[in-house]
Regions:
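ABC-type ATPase nucleotide-binding domains, specifically the catalytic core motifs of the NBD
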Residues: 1-5, 16, 99
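Conserved ABC ATPase signature
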Residues: 13-17, 21
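P-loop NTP-binding/switch modules centered on Walker-like glycine-rich loops
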Residues: 34-39, 43-129
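Short catalytic/signature loops enriched in Gly
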Residues: 98-188
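Conserved ABC ATPase "signature" region
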Residues: 1-8, 114-118
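Interfacial catalytic loop of ABC nucleotide-binding domains
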Residues: 8-13, 128
Length: 188
């Protein structure tokens, strides 16, 4: 009942459930042992927008009611903007930027976060031109020297390719792992 499922769902088979119902069942199962931490990996992927919003609303309410901490792993920036307080932006397995969602999305400091924000279409999806980030991710089977994003970054300097970037705390409290943080804006 906490996740919005009628009792009849208990007797149903997985193939009889919609995508949203299956997500709710998964969430209900994960809450059975009263966890303090709930990790949700792409919890709203492949759901229609209305069902996504319902699931997110339910998750936020469960977080409040049960006092459970929620970590969401997602590539959907709209989900982050709607349902999260903090965001950690990762590239090649490293957190490159961390902070309050509003601050990071409004004024991203890391060149990867800035490039990621530019990939979001400003127009309706039917007419939007999707802009990707040029280049390829690094080979993660080998140790990365310097910044993992350097080969794709238009602002990269020699230091970026040769030295691991420092973690810098910005005036607003966000943390950025970049040699250029705060001093240079990524050209759009």
């Amino acid at each position: 009942e906490m996740v919005g499922l009628p009792p009849r769902v208990y007797d149903m088979y997985p193939h009889e459930l919609s995508g949203g119902m299956m997500q709710r069942v998964s969430i209900a199962l994960s809450l059975m042992h009263h966890p303090k931490l709930l990790i949700l990996d792409e919890a709203t992927t492949a759901l229609d927008v209305i069902t996504q919003r319902q699931i997110l609303d339910e998750l936020m309410e469960l977080e409040r009611q049960l006092q459970v901490t929620r970590i969401m792993i997602t590539h959907d920036i709209a989900t982050v903007a709607y349902a999260c307080h903090k965001v950690a932006v990762m590239y090649a397995g490293q957190i490159v930027e961390f902070g309050d969602v509003a601050d990071v999305l409004r004024e991203p400091q890391h060149p990867y976060t800035q490039a990621l924000m530019r990939t979001i279409p400003a127009q309706p999806r039917e007419t939007a031109i999707v802009r990707g980030i040029p280049g390829s991710i690094p080979d993660l089977s080998e140790p990365i020297r310097g910044c993992a994003f350097a080969d794709r970054c238009s602002l990269a300097r020699n230091i970026c390719r040769n030295e691991e970037p420092p973690q810098i705390t910005m005036p607003g409290g966000s943390q950025v792992q970049c040699h250029l943080a705060g001093g240079v804006k990524h050209a759009g």
